[in-house]
Amino acid sequence: MANIRTLSDYASSPPRGSSALEGEVGQGGSPLPLFFPSGTQSGENVSWIQWLCPGIHLKSPIIIISFVQIAVYIASLAAGLAPNEILAPTPQTLVMFGANIPELIRVGEIWRLICPLFLHLNLFHILMNLWVQIRIGLTMEEKYGWKMLLAVYFGVGVLANMISAAVLFCGQMKAGASTAVFALIGVQLAELALIWHAIQDRNSAIISVCICLFFVFVSSFGSHMDSVGHIGGLVMGFAAGIWLNENSDIKPTWYDRARLTSQVALAAAPILSCIFIFLVPRC
């Protein structure tokens, strides 16, 4: 099995006043495992599955979620194929399967905040989301545990859908698990920001961030793509990542301010979203 790269692979030396760098960062997980996920021992044979998704195991919650998403995607295609697109369900099918439609959420169809996490718009959409969420999710599960992984995936994913519904309300239909996927990316970016002062190979980290931003750019276009949800998931995931690392021994000097800001953001976002979705006159 491929080794999951830890934060110590990026860190050069303990910051002043800290001697626990190597011990703390070796608890699994790494910044942006999507692009620099693992290291293999010399002569180790790694299967293509382990190369694509290091540390994969079928009992992982993220794997189970992925299988459910595949089943839902196949069912949505069976319900109706969109013309002139590659294996894409029709808009009517997306509505039937619970797409994010703010006007319907306002009248009580609350399930439309979570159902989009299992929907995909076309073949490229589901393949990209599955690869990213499995690759990052496995690393997050190793570091934070499966319960926290699920809390971030569904909690921040639903919150991002709420933000999207609050911002783009009238005549909108949005779908896709990308809001939750961007939440996972946000957590990884937060980790990277928190250990930046201790990173030895910053060039690799910069390349990783650039590739991440390219993914953000590419994933934000297309019919029914939820660009606001992507940004909401990324920002709220970043805030969650700041909070999740409060016990780190290599926190930067600005951590306390960042933690307070993240807590305020995570508390205010659902309240403001509910106000704009359910109380503020729209359309």
UniProtKB/Swiss-Prot annotation:
<dbReference type="Pfam" id="PF01694">
    <property type="entry name" value="Rhomboid"/>
</dbReference>
<feature type="active site">
    <location>
        <position position="230"/>
    </location>
</feature>
<feature type="transmembrane region" description="Helical">
    <location>
        <begin position="114"/>
        <end position="134"/>
    </location>
</feature>
<keyword id="KW-0720">Serine protease</keyword>
<comment type="function">
    <text>Serine protease involved in intramembrane proteolysis and the subsequent release of polypeptides from their membrane anchors.</text>
</comment>
<protein>
    <recommendedName>
        <fullName>Rhomboid-like protease 2</fullName>
        <ecNumber>3.4.21.105</ecNumber>
    </recommendedName>
</protein>
<dbReference type="GO" id="GO:0016020">
    <property type="term" value="C:membrane"/>
</dbReference>
<feature type="transmembrane region" description="Helical">
    <location>
        <begin position="260"/>
        <end position="280"/>
    </location>
</feature>
<dbReference type="InterPro" id="IPR022764">
    <property type="entry name" value="Peptidase_S54_rhomboid_dom"/>
</dbReference>
<feature type="transmembrane region" description="Helical">
    <location>
        <begin position="149"/>
        <end position="169"/>
    </location>
</feature>
<keyword id="KW-0472">Membrane</keyword>
<dbReference type="InterPro" id="IPR002610">
    <property type="entry name" value="Peptidase_S54_rhomboid-like"/>
</dbReference>
<feature type="transmembrane region" description="Helical">
    <location>
        <begin position="205"/>
        <end position="225"/>
    </location>
</feature>
<dbReference type="GO" id="GO:0004252">
    <property type="term" value="F:serine-type endopeptidase activity"/>
</dbReference>
<keyword id="KW-0812">Transmembrane</keyword>
<feature type="compositionally biased region" description="Polar residues">
    <location>
        <begin position="1"/>
        <end position="11"/>
    </location>
</feature>
<feature type="transmembrane region" description="Helical">
    <location>
        <begin position="62"/>
        <end position="82"/>
    </location>
</feature>
<comment type="similarity">
    <text>Belongs to the peptidase S54 family.</text>
</comment>
<keyword id="KW-0645">Protease</keyword>
<dbReference type="GO" id="GO:0006508">
    <property type="term" value="P:proteolysis"/>
</dbReference>
<feature type="transmembrane region" description="Helical">
    <location>
        <begin position="227"/>
        <end position="247"/>
    </location>
</feature>
<keyword id="KW-1133">Transmembrane helix</keyword>
<feature type="region of interest" description="Disordered">
    <location>
        <begin position="1"/>
        <end position="26"/>
    </location>
</feature>
<feature type="active site" description="Nucleophile">
    <location>
        <position position="178"/>
    </location>
</feature>
<feature type="transmembrane region" description="Helical">
    <location>
        <begin position="179"/>
        <end position="199"/>
    </location>
</feature>
<dbReference type="InterPro" id="IPR035952">
    <property type="entry name" value="Rhomboid-like_sf"/>
</dbReference>
<keyword id="KW-0378">Hydrolase</keyword>
